[in-house]
Amino acid sequence: MKKLAITCALLSGMVVSQVWADAASDLKSRLDKVSSFHASFTQKVTDGSGNAVQDGQGDLWVKRPNLFNWHMTQPDESVLVSDGKTLWFYNPFVEQATATWLKDATSNTPFMLIARNQSSDWQQYNIKQNGDDFVLTPKSGSGNLKQFTINVGRDGTIHQFSAVEQDDQRSSYQLKSQQNGAVDASKFTFTPPKGVTVDDQRK
């Protein structure tokens, strides 16, 4: 009886692992169907009790695997740009830009996961699939991300994604008007405006 219980437990674990692997493979396959795109987005942030914290909007340009431009326009403007090597974060309000190596950037943020779409990143999560919805839970509990959900169609179109942090704050993003196709290379370059303080952390 004990041997049977152990065998059943092992088989159950193998089945679950296979389901997670299949979900990860399907998610990556769907995202691979679109190599570059532009979309506008709306943002809604709520606290652990469901109270509204912030509403925002902006635009997103991606050329996988390492080029992207995340431009938040409201309520406060901010820009996150990767030229493939350097990751720039620019805050016009405080007139400051920060430069870090992209290779050193954390992979446990929803946007980085979507923009890079690398197998090594997805392998860090247990992934469950329900139709076009994918729910990701980090295998390691050391980061700030508690859960990540993304809805992506079979054609690779991302409709929405959300992230829940350890304190249960939720950030939800609705993407609309996704346009698949070539993106102007200028969207993936950044030159700090004159007078802006640059914090260069690449040294």
UniProtKB/Swiss-Prot annotation:
GO terms for biological process: lipoprotein localization to outer membrane; lipoprotein transport. Pfam families: LolA. Keywords: Chaperone, Periplasm, Protein transport, Signal, Transport. Residues 1-21 form the signal peptide. GO terms for cellular component: outer membrane-bounded periplasmic space. Transmembrane segments: none annotated. Residues 184-203 are annotated as: Disordered. It comes from the Bacteria. It is found in: Periplasm. InterPro entries: LolA/LolB/LppX (IPR029046), OM_lipoprot_carrier_LolA-like (IPR004564), OM_lipoprot_carrier_LolA_Pbac (IPR018323). The keyword Acyltransferase does not apply. Belongs to the LolA family. Participates in the translocation of lipoproteins from the inner membrane to the outer membrane. Only forms a complex with a lipoprotein if the residue after the N-terminal Cys is not an aspartate (The Asp acts as a targeting signal to indicate that the lipoprotein should stay in the inner membrane). Monomer. This is Outer-membrane lipoprotein carrier protein. It comes from Klebsiella pneumoniae (strain 342). The gene is lolA.
